[in-house]
């Protein structure tokens, strides 16, 4: 087994620097011997996707007395993706062996990953060629972060000794149960979740209207047969309901290979050239 003290880890999140999830993760990894640096938003930045700060300055400040003394921690005024970019370019001296984003307070399952600042911070690492993991606790009410943090220790060792293919992000969701109630670990495909969007119209004290987004989760929708993996492989949404830790490999290349091949073999391109 590789000595953890030789492995450098950069941790970020979208819940903010003072979130319990990132504190539990960072302290657990540091106490296991890993070299840990934390760079997180200075406040909650959930559902910011892969947004970047382009029109105002980004500020970063050292955070003391919140994490294990062995950890160097920074708060950043930008988005989760800003945090990773700034860390790699300006804040840390040594290129990390891994980037871990989380542990998010709430799941990142199915199409949630498209909106997730947690996943985007990890994806920024993949874009930079660094093995990266996004970790989420699949509940907004539970505070059972320790099982996920403990799992991260072993997962990083495994990925260090047996790396994933390049450009592969591992999206991990942890069921909100005690360690002894976790059913196991399951490799899953990304599910498809949709929400009934409800923009509630409200009025401020000056009588000016504004809108507040609220959403109600719709039961998971099955994906079309041509999308990537056969339906007998469980989705992350299905597996988490049975208390499995889900491992879903993701990538930043969004090319739809099946549709590309369909367009190649059905004279679609030739016909499109005749469109006026």
From Swiss-Prot:
Question: So what EC number does this one have?
Answer: 3.1.3.5
Its localization reads: Cytoplasm
Record: residues binding a divalent metal cation = 14-15, 46, 104
Key word Endoplasmic reticulum present: no
| Protein's name according to its UniProt entry | 5'-nucleotidase SurE
Would you identify the family this protein belongs to, as annotated? Belongs to the SurE nucleotidase family.
Reactions that this protein is recorded to catalyse: a ribonucleoside 5'-phosphate + H2O = a ribonucleoside + phosphate
- Say which enzyme class the record assigns: hydrolase
Q: Which gene encodes it?
A: surE
Q: Is Nucleotide-binding found in the keyword set?
A: yes
**Which cofactors must be present for this protein to function?**
a divalent metal cation
Could you give one GO CC term from the UniProt record? cytoplasm
């Amino acid at each position: 087994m590789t000595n953890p003290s030789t492995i450098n880890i950069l941790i970020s999140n979208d819940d903010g620097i003072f979130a319990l999830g990132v504190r539990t993760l960072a302290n657990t990894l540091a106490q296991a011997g890993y070299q840990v640096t934390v760079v997180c938003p200075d406040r909650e930045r959930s559902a910011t996707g892969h947004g970047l700060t382009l029109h105002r300055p980004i500020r970063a400040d050292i955070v003391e007395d919140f994490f294990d003394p062995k950890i160097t921690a920074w708060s950043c005024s930008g988005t989760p993706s800003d945090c990773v970019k700034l860390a790699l370019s300006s804040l840390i001296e040594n290129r990390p062996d891994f980037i871990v984003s989380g542990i998010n307070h709430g799941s990142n399952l199915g199409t949630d990953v498209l909106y997730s600042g947690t996943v985007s911070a990890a994806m920024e690492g993949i874009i930079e060629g660094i093995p990266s993991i996004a970790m989420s606790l699949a509940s907004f009410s539970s505070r059972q972060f320790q099982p996920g943090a403990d799992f991260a220790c072993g997962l990083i060792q495994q990925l260090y000794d047996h790396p994933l293919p390049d450009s592969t992000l591992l999206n991990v969701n942890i069921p909100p149960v005690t360690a002894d109630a976790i059913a196991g670990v399951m490799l899953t495909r990304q599910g498809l979740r949709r929400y009934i969007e409800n923009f509630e119209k409200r009025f401020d004290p000056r009588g000016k209207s504004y809108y507040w987004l609220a959403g109600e989760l719709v039961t998971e929708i099955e994906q079309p047969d041509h999308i990537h993996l056969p339906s007998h492989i469980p989705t992350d949404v299905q597996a988490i309901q049975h208390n499995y830790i889900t491992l879903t490999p993701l990538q930043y290349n969004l090319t739809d290979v099946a549709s590309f091949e369909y367009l190649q073999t059905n004279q679609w391109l030739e016909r499109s050239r005749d469109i006026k």
